[in-house]
C-alpha cells in the first residue's frame, strides 16, 4: 500500500526537485498538445484535422490514464516520466512529417501514451512525499506546468513557425531529450518510495471507488465538461482569434499566452486559497461558475472589441478554465482510499479525458455547422450544469489548513 507522507524530514526526499520535475513533465506534454494548434494558421492545418489530433490524443489518454497509477506503483513515477518524454519526442517527429495532412492524427495517437499516464504518476509520488496540509498548494504548483508549457509554446512557436514550421517541432524534441536526462538522474532517489505498490489492481477495482463514494462520483462527472472547456480554450483560441476576431497569428498567439498566464496565476492563487482560506470543494465550485461565465463572454466577443478588453477576457478565461486542476486533484487525493491515490486519480481522470475527447469534437462539429462562438457558448452551458451538481459539498469537506 502507498504510505502517507514521510514524517521524518531528514530521511524524506525533498519535495522541490520532484515538484519541479513533474511540473516540467506536464509543461513538455502541454507544449506537444498545443503545438499544432498554435502553428495551425501558418501551416494551414484545418480545424477538422486539428480536432482529430487533439481527439486522438485524448482517446488514447482515456485508456492509459488509469495505467499511469499502476505503472508508477510498479516501475516508479520517474520511470513513467522518462517514458513520457520519449513519447513526446516521437510525437513531434511524426507531427513534423505529417504537416497539415490528416496523418497528424497519428501523432495524436502516440501523444496519448504520454498524456494519459503523466498526471496519475505525478500524483502518486507527490502525495507520498508531501504533508497533508501542503497538498492543495503543491498539487496546484505542479499543475502550473500546463500553463508554463502553454505560455512558452504560445509565445515562441508563432515566431519559429514564421521562419519554418519544423523549427517548433524540433525545439520541443530537444526539450524532451533534456527532460529525459533529468528524470533519469532523479529516478533512483524517488522511485523506490512508490515502486511495488501498484501491481495487481484491476480497473474495475479503481472504478469501484467511484461507485462507493458519492463525492468522487460528482468530481468525476464535473471533470468531463471542465476538461472539455479547458481544451477548447487551449486548442481553438488561436484559430478563433484569427478567423473570427480579425487578429494576426502573433496577436492570437499572445492572446493564448495571456490566457495561459491567467491559468498560471489561477492555479497558484486557488491552491493557496484552498490551503488557507476556503475548503477545496468550495473553491472548485466557484471556479466552475467562473469558467462558465467566461466562456459566455468569449462567445460574445467581436472584432470591434478593444485589444485591452480581449486580453482581459482571455486572462480571466485562463484563470478559471485552466486554474481548477490543482485544487481539483488535491481534493481527489484527499477523498481517495488509503494507499490508492494513483488508481483513484486515474479513475476520475478517465472522465476528464472523456471530456478532452468530447471537447474538440464538439468544437469542430459546431464550428462546421455554425461558428466557434456558438461552440464556446455550448461548452460553457455544459460546464454550468456540471457545477450545479457540485454545489452540495461532501459530508467531510476539506477545511483550509
PLM regions and their residue ranges:
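Conserved MFS/SLC helix-loop-helix module at the cytosolic interface between two early adjacent transmembrane helices
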Residues: 63-99
Amino acid at each position: 500500500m502507498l504510505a502517507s507522507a514521510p514524517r521524518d524530514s531528514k530521511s524524506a526526499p525533498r519535495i522541490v526537485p520532484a515538484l519541479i520535475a513533474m511540473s516540467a513533465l506536464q509543461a513538455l506534454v502541454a507544449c506537444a498538445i498545443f503545438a499544432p494548434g498554435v502553428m495551425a494558421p501558418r501551416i494551414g492545418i484545418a480545424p477538422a484535422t486539428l480536432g482529430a489530433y487533439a481527439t486522438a490524443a485524448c482517446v488514447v489518454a482515456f485508456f492509459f490514464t488509469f495505467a499511469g497509477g499502476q505503472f508508477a506503483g510498479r516501475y516508479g513515477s520517474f520511470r513513467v516520466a522518462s517514458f513520457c518524454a520519449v513519447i513526446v519526442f516521437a510525437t513531434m517527429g511524426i507531427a513534423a512529417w505529417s504537416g497539415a495532412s490528416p496523418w497528424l492524427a497519428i501523432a495524436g495517437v502516440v501523444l496519448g501514451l504520454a498524456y494519459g499516464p503523466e498526471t496519475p504518476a505525478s500524483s502518486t509520488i507527490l502525495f507520498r512525499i508531501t504533508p497533508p496540509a501542503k497538498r492543495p498548494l503543491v498539487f496546484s504548483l505542479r499543475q502550473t506546468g500546463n500553463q508554463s508549457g502553454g505560455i512558452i509554446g504560445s509565445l515562441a512557436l508563432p515566431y519559429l513557425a514564421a521562419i519554418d514550421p519544423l523549427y517548433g517541432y524540433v525545439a520541443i524534441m530537444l526539450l524532451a531529450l533534456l527532460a529525459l536526462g533529468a528524470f533519469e538522474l532523479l529516478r533512483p532517489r524517488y522511485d523506490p518510495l512508490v515502486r511495488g505498490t501498484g501491481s495487481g489492481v484491476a480497473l474495475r477495482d479503481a472504478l469501484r471507488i467511484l461507485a462507493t463514494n458519492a463525492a468522487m462520483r460528482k468530481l468525476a462527472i464535473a471533470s468531463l465538461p471542465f476538461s472539455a472547456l479547458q481544451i477548447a480554450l487551449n486548442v481553438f483560441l488561436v484559430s478563433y482569434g484569427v478567423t473570427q476576431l480579425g487578429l494576426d497569428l502573433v496577436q492570437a498567439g499572445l492572446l493564448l499566452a495571456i490566457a495561459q498566464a491567467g491559468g498560471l496565476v489561477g492555479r497558484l492563487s486557488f491552491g493557496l486559497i484552498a490551503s488557507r482560506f476556503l475548503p477545496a470543494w468550495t473553491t472548485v465550485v466557484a471556479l466552475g461558475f467562473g469558467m462558465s461565465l467566461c466562456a459566455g463572454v468569449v462567445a460574445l466577443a467581436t472584432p470591434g472589441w478593444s485589444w485591452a478588453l480581449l486580453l482581459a477576457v482571455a486572462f480571466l478565461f485562463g484563470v478559471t478554465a485552466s486554474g481548477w486542476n490543482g485544487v481539483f486533484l488535491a481534493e481527489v487525493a484527499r477523498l481517495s482510499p488509503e494507499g490508492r491515490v494513483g488508481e483513484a486519480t486515474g479513475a476520475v481522470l478517465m472522465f476528464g479525458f472523456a471530456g478532452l475527447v468530447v471537447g474538440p469534437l464538439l468544437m469542430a462539429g459546431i464550428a462546421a455547422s455554425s461558428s466557434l462562438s456558438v461552440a464556446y457558448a455550448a461548452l460553457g452551458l455544459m460546464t454550468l450544469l456540471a457545477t450545479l451538481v457540485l454545489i452540495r459539498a461532501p459530508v467531510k469537506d476539506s477545511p483550509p489548513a
